[in-house]
Regions:
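Soluble FAD-dependent oxygen oxidases
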Residues: 1-298
Length: 298
């Protein structure tokens, strides 16, 4: 999203409404694209749009959970050569109440319809799917298809980090430690990166993680009214087993992250971000976030 930001109106810590764009306050514009909520309250965004047909080829394709390691390994390889107009997430979910675990790919292909069968054919060939729901679908409907997946009255505890390679060791760790539980759902999912994300220079925005292949998220969900502690503790334990395979994290997903890790996560952009923070929020008013600390005031 930040790569398509053309401009923003933002109220900074001094109460001023400012315009941030290539032509106005370009330092602030640069920082907003990856620096999170450190610089003020944004009241409007201007985004670059991209022409596309409303109808795409998309949906979910389910596989036997017993084939999870094989499916994830295939997915990792398949993602390396897929076209930019194909986006595929992988989801593993162990539901509560002893229900059967699920494994599926969430697909959106926005290329030419005549090429869809050829591009998607490997997903249907390498392992026989349990259910194939990939079909022509309205793009907006596809975007809204998961709106009810996080209903009110549900607690959740998530952790995430970037991966550059989905290694065999990571696959083994994910599957062998995903725990079924009568009272909670347990999950892991990969969100695809790469593609156009890698085409932008690291210094062009405040987002430095251009070489990642995926964002990996793990977590637990449970009905409200239950004690959250054991479920959150399980998610933390699961994360501790897989976090060694990650390298950095998405700023908006940061929760309960050590402040030192937050600083190092900005990599080569940190010094420039600190300069912008010190200019627009020298007292660190906007600090309930992945906080960039301003330089000490004289």
């Amino acid at each position: 999203t930040s790569d398509n930001l053309l401009a923003a109106d933002i109220v900074t810590s001094d109460g001023e409404l400012r315009r941030a764009s290539v032509d106005e306050n370009p330092d602030l514009y640069w920082a907003l694209r990856g620096g999170g909520g450190n610089f003020g309250v944004v009241t409007s965004f201007d985004f670059q749009l991209h022409p596309m047909d409303r109808q795409v080829i998309g949906g979910e394709i389910y596989y036997p959970y017993e084939k999870a390691k094989e499916v994830i390994s295939f997915y990792a390889e398949y993602c390396q050569d897929m076209p930019d107009d194909l986006y595929v997430d992988l989801v593993i979910f162990a539901p509560p109440f002893g229900l059967k675990s699920a494994l599926y790919l969430d697909v959106c292909y926005s290329g030419h319809p005549k090429d869809a069968a050829r591009v998607l054919e490997p997903l249907r060939r390498f392992v026989k799917p349990l259910k194939d729901e990939i079909r022509p679908v309205d793009y907006v409907a596809l975007q809204k298809s998961s709106d009810d997946s996080d209903p009110r009255g549900t607690g959740q505890h998530l952790k995430s980090g970037f991966v550059k390679t989905i290694s065999k060791a990571l696959v083994d760790t994910l599957i062998e430690n995903l725990e079924s539980n009568m009272l909670r759902g347990s999950m892991a999912f990969f969100q695809q990166a790469g593609g156009a994300i890698r085409e932008i220079a690291t210094s062009a925005t405040a987002f430095p993680h251009r070489e990642i292949s995926h964002n990996l998220t793990i977590g637990a969900v449970w009905p409200s009214g239950l004690d959250p502690e054991p479920h959150a503790a399980w998610a933390d334990s699961y994360w501790n087993k897989v976090k060694g395979f990650t390298d950095g994290f998405y700023t908006n997903d940061a929760y309960g992250v050590d402040p030192v890790q937050v600083q190092t996560n900005y990599l080569t952009t940190l010094d420039r971000l600190v300069d912008v923070k010190s200019k627009y929020d020298p007292a660190n008013l906007f600090r309930i976030n992945s906080n960039i600390r301003p330089r000490p005031q004289a």
